[in-house]
Amino acid sequence: ANFRLKFGLIVTLIFFIIGFVVYYVPHVNPFTFNTYPNKLGASAEHWLGTTSMGQDVVWLLIEAIHNSLVIGLIVAVLGTVVGVFVGLLSGFAGGLLDRGLMIVTDTFVVIPSLPILIMMTSLMKGSSTTIVMALVLAMFAWAWPSRQIRSMALSIKERDFIHTAKFSGESTVQIVVTEILPYALTWSLSNFMNATLSAIGSESSLAVLGLSPGNLVSLGNMIQWARSYNAIFNKQYLWIGAPIVATVILFVGLFLLITGYNDYLSMKRGR
């Protein structure tokens, strides 16, 4: 039994239930100011109290989890799909196209992403949305999986069953879809989870620096707002503690899910 895989899956599922099921329970818009009295402590009505702007911390946290997961999923989908496509195309095409694609890919792998992300988010600050933020982060999410998929394609295309498929009259597209893609998708699931984790971490880092969209309720922005309003000095520990604890637990859950899944794949290969 893979404990890490099971535990990570349970933790991740809990966050997805909070972010995509509980989120749609009818409630007051948590971003609206002065909905409730300011700086309330924990109570039966407000489990984690209220902020200095009169917002319910629980619903603010649920909104933040939802938006952070949306950003992570968009980045993971775009990065994985583009990475798999470019990697397979490069690995099977070869020649000049392969060299050209790898030059672009290597450029995106080696250039430092954080300074560019800081510059772009600074330029778009105030006008950015959840989707735009995700698209910016996705710019750097495809390059590494592209290299991995290309290496996989180069290795697999020389195996006997690929040559057999060619001799049997299958086209290149058929071979890629039926023979190569299943291998790529197995690895891509691990990359998908890793990209989700990385995107949430990147957005949180930018938010704490004050560079995430100010109208976006995310885990990072929750921490930034609590810090800006001196939550610690005002002894509003639940306000600043809730997003920090949620971020840590989400990261641990995703990390255990990724490592557990990789161990599972290693066990399958060893059989």
Predicted regions and their residues:
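Transmembrane alpha-helix signature in integral membrane proteins
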Residues: 57-92
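Glycine-rich helix-loop "coupling/hinge" segments at transmembrane-helix boundaries
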Residues: 122-123, 153, 202-242, 246
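Membrane-cytosol interface at the C-terminal ends of specific transmembrane alpha-helices
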Residues: 76, 84, 88, 126-178, ...
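Alpha-helical membrane-protein architecture signal
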Residues: 50, 58, 62, 97-104, ...
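N-terminal signal-anchor/first transmembrane alpha helix
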Residues: 1-31, 101-104, 174, 184, ...
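Hydrophobic alpha-helical transmembrane segments of membrane transport/permease proteins
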Residues: 10-52, 207-216
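Generic hydrophobic transmembrane alpha-helix motif, especially the helices
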Residues: 47, 57, 91-92, 97-156, ...
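C-terminal transmembrane helix and the adjacent membrane-cytosol boundary/short C-terminal tail
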Residues: 126, 140, 193-194, 233-271
